[in-house]
């Protein structure tokens, strides 16, 4: 990567970094006369440090693969875009991806501790830290997060991890109007409830997911609100029920997914939206 950028800089060639090419905005599209630098083969997990709850990884690894790798240490990486099975960590960092769990756990920038980046000159820069607290100097790491490859090519990332959460409880509510579903979300926040997942799917999305999965998903509603709680057995059920009460107060038809297969179907529907549409 260093050599490629140094040569491109010498000859004035534009450089486009590419990860898994799963983004929809065209940020990784090639430019005529330019040089594409692909990181898709840079998939190694270089280190997992359970004591400091961090992982050091190359940028080409898929989000889901990294998540599964750290699970064996009793840890998890919260940012989980719906495309997590086929989007890369480098792309997540470059676009500051969120995910289905961002309502509780935040977005990618909240977990990037440090980066190794190759600049346009071919120079390698290391930013950030390996500690929870790091307040000295300019926060160059956050400058690169979300920069979509315009400032350099990410070649290594140090990411914060969390202790593995409990198996989530899942529920959903059907609404006759998207406005009622949106008002429910606002009411959930106002009530101080913090589910581990809170997602809306409108009727168009539900039909697309149903066709794609060949599944019997609800299609006679204007919107479906999906939520989860990872607080554990009793606390999780209580939080699920509390959100259900809020949804019912806004004319939602609440469904508690006690069957793991039903819960998995709802989650698969949400994760399939990108390709289904």
Language-model features: where?
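Noncatalytic alpha-helical scaffold of FAD-dependent oxidoreductases
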Residues: 1-277
């Amino acid at each position: 990567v260093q050599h490629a950028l140094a040569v491109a800089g010498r000859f004035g060639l534009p450089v486009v970094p590419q990860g898994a090419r799963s983004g929809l905005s065209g940020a990784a599209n090639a430019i005529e006369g330019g040089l594409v630098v692909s990181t898709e083969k840079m998939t190694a997990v270089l280190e997992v440090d359970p004591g400091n709850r961090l992982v050091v990884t190359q940028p080409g690894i898929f989000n889901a693969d990294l998540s599964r790798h750290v699970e064996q240490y009793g840890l998890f990486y919260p940012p989980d875009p719906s495309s997590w099975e086929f989007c890369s960590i480098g792309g997540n960092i470059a676009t500051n991806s969120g995910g289905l769990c961002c309502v509780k756990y935040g977005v990618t920038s909240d977990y990037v501790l440090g980066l190794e980046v190759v600049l346009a000159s071919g120079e390698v820069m290391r930013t950030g830290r390996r500690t929870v607290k790091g307040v000295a100097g300019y926060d160059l790491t956050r400058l690169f997060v979300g920069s979509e490859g315009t400032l350099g090519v990410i070649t290594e990332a140090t990411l914060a991890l969390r202790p593995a959460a409990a198996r989530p409880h899942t529920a959903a509510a059907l609404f006759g109007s998207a406005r009622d579903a949106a008002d429910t979300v606002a009411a959930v926040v106002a009530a101080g409830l913090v589910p581990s997942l809170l997602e809306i799917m409108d009727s168009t999305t539900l039909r697309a997911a149903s066709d794609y999965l060949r599944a019997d998903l609800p299609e006679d509603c204007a919107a479906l609100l999906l939520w989860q709680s990872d607080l554990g057995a009793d606390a999780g059920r209580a939080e699920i029920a509390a959100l259900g009460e809020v949804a019912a107060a806004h004319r939602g038809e609440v469904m508690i997914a006690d069957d793991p297969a039903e819960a998995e179907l709802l989650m698969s529907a949400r994760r399939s939206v990108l390709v289904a549409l």
